[in-house]
Amino acid sequence: VFSLKSEKSFGVGDFGDLRRMIDWAVITHQKVIQILPVNDTTMTHAWTDSYPYNSISIYAFHPMYADIKQMGTLKDKEAASKFNKKQKELNSLPAIDYEAVNQTKWEFFNLLFRQEGKKVLASKGFKDFFEANKEWLQPYAVFSYLRDAYKTPNFRKWPRHSVYNAEDIEKMCQPETVDYPHISLYYYIQYHLHLQLLSATEYARQHGVVLKGDIPIGISRNSVEAWTEPHYFNLNGQAGAPPDDFSINGQNWGFPTYNWDVMEKDGYRWWMKRFQKMAEYFDAYRIDHI
């Protein structure tokens, strides 16, 4: 999606550009658009986070893909003018400036959240989204908040909450806590991303185009899932591929392997939930590398 940058983008292709890609597919008589993973890969806020196969969540989308024009308009005219100028600057670059794009979009998210956040979080649409996605959304939001607070995605190094405790996390997420404004910002962004990708999906279906997603077979060892569900993984192992014509030394992807015996005991619930979530947005998907 990042490569779909258009004149309406903010320095990088976004979910709004997907609709323009669908229009092109219709004009050129194409039936399927396959995209790379669009999950959040934010580890350090550096350009090294741009690798789409090392996500911090199997559910959350990367905030970078939010079409800020769909999100809303800033009432502060001076701030709005500043972002319009920045959009033109970032769009004029010959290559995507990953760090600048993300930093600028986050500045926008914070301002718009202060302006619109309470109203959106009180809406029926958001409440329905939250209840349907709370199981993954709440841990993801807290993980992201603590990652930035402790300046590392390696939860083992966090001075507090290094071992996931659902009750403690639930307490942090109560609206009266000092943590809540920081945590709920992630709810707000994920809600907008959900609406935007769902809109693109419905648009594709209306035009007879299949959106095909991509599921990385592995998870990051510094991810929400490794933090909240370590029993599903062999965190002392590393997945990869043996030598072949493309890599004479083989490949070490660094991802932990799955504990299939544990997964089998609950009927592969972890995978079922993952596939069901993907099916909300995609009519087909690839499991890479299977």
Q: For each of these PLM feature ranges, what is it?
A:
Residues 193-206, 210:
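Active-site pocket-lining segments that scaffold enzyme catalytic pockets across diverse folds
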Residues 25, 35, 143, 204, ...:
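Conserved, mostly hydrophobic/aromatic
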Residues 2, 38-40, 216-220, 290:
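Active-site beta-loop-alpha junctions enriched in small/polar residues
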Residues 7, 45-195, 218-290:
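Alpha-amylase-like alpha-glycosidases and glucanotransferases acting on alpha-linked glucans and related
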Residues 17-41, 277-284:
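Catalytic domains of carbohydrate-active enzymes, especially glycoside hydrolases
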Residues 10-13, 24:
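N-terminal ordered "arm"
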Residues 32, 208-212, 284-286:
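Structural preference for beta-strand elements that scaffold enzyme active sites
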Residues 1-5, 10:
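An acidic-aromatic substrate-binding cleft motif
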